[in-house]
């Protein structure tokens, strides 16, 4: 879900919980009694906000994976992110994810003018979410310690990014961090992406005779 991002003021949610339809069962991941889609598509009229939905999650991924040291050369465009804001509220981003070990996590953060206002990570056990860590400004609470006393936290950097590097053996942090590393968001309507695909297909046709024969059937 995301809120106050570009043209979206109110909270919007992309729900990937599977319906009762039985088509394309290969695209469904099952956890206990719940089923989730592995892939989803967004479609709609022109200028309806489809690209901004993708950019919200792409922005979230970049904030997590780009360290503070490399932000100067990063593709994060802070000014463009806020260009459609109509108030002084922070951007709020949150995902509920299914990790590779079938654990379910809820992770999110709020950011205002490139400063992290809050950040949180919860793990789902049975039907309830339990806190792994919660952050307010530069203060982080994580049982059994108050991490702000142990780690120098920059106001622009996410704690998930920091602690994933400090404690590489922490399963919860690595599960969430790796999920973002392996997640992909594609804008099929982007002309640059279309040119990339067309070039790849053209090269495939030129270099692979079997592929060429299949296309000509």
Where are these regions (language model features)?
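A generic structural motif
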Residues: 3-5, 96-100, 122-124
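Pre-Walker A-like glycine/lysine-rich segment at the N-terminus of P-loop NTPase domains
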Residues: 2-59
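Electropositive, glycine-dotted interaction segments
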Residues: 106-217
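Short beta-strand segments
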Residues: 10-14, 103-107, 131
């Amino acid at each position: 879900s995301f809120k106050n991002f570009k043209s979206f003021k109110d909270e919007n949610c992309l729900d990937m919980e599977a319906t009762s339809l039985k088509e394309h069962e290969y695209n469904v991941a099952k956890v206990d009694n719940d089923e989730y889609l592995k892939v989803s598509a967004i479609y709609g009229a022109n200028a309806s906000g489809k690209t901004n939905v993708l950019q919200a999650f792409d922005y979230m991924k970049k904030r997590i994976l780009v360290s503070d040291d490399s932000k100067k050369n990063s593709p994060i465009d802070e000014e463009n992110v806020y260009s459609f804001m109509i108030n002084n509220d922070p951007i709020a981003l949150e995902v509920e994810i299914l990790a590779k070990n079938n654990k379910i996590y809820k992770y999110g953060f709020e950011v205002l003018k490139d400063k992290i206002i809050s950040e949180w990570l919860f793990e789902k056990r049975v039907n309830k979410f339990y806190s792994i860590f919660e952050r307010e400004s530069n203060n982080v609470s994580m049982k059994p310690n108050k991490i702000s006393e142990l780690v120098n936290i920059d106001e622009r950097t996410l704690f998930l990014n920091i602690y994933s590097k400090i404690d590489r053996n922490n399963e919860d942090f690595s599960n969430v961090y790796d999920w973002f590393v392996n997640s992909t968001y594609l804008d099929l309507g982007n002309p640059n992406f279309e040119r990339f695909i067309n070039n790849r297909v053209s090269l495939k046709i030129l270099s692979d005779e079997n592929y060429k024969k299949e296309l000509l059937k």
